[in-house]
Amino acid sequence: MKTRAQVFRVQFNNVLIRLDMLLNNEIDALWLTEPQATKARILGNPMLRDSRDFKVALGVLALRTAGVSDARRKAQLAAFVKGYNRACDSLNQRGLQAYADVIARRCKADKATLQALPKLYYSHIAPPRQQDIAAAAHAFKD
């Protein structure tokens, strides 16, 4: 859908700054990660779209071939993948509430936000799907 309104694509890498801008009416709409998206909803901001509805996985772990060419680097990568996948399993089995203290400390989330977090599923590291590659390529055509 096209709009006549003037739209600017800006990038703010700090999610806490993005949330503050929304809460202070300095920005009209933006993508938020959890737990910031939950905080925005609690404070009455409407959710226009939920990225989980898109059925696309755009998270990426990208490495240079030269960066994993020797045995030591391959072992480091294998250990990283194993640790990441175990963390996903733990989050999926125990839920975010089991890590509420870490989320509160690292993400500056309050108790109400922590209690309202949605049930999320975390995927293991896997090669990109063709549909995700196509979606990423399409996004950069604009």
Label each region the model flagged.
Residues T3-N24, P35:
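Short helix-initiation/N-cap motifs at beta->coil->alpha
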Residues D28-N45:
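A ligand-binding cleft/hinge motif common to bilobed small-molecule-binding domains
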Residues A71-D142:
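Secondary-structure end/capping motifs
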Residues L16, P35-T38, R52-V56, G67-V68:
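Solvent-exposed loop/turn segments at secondary-structure junctions
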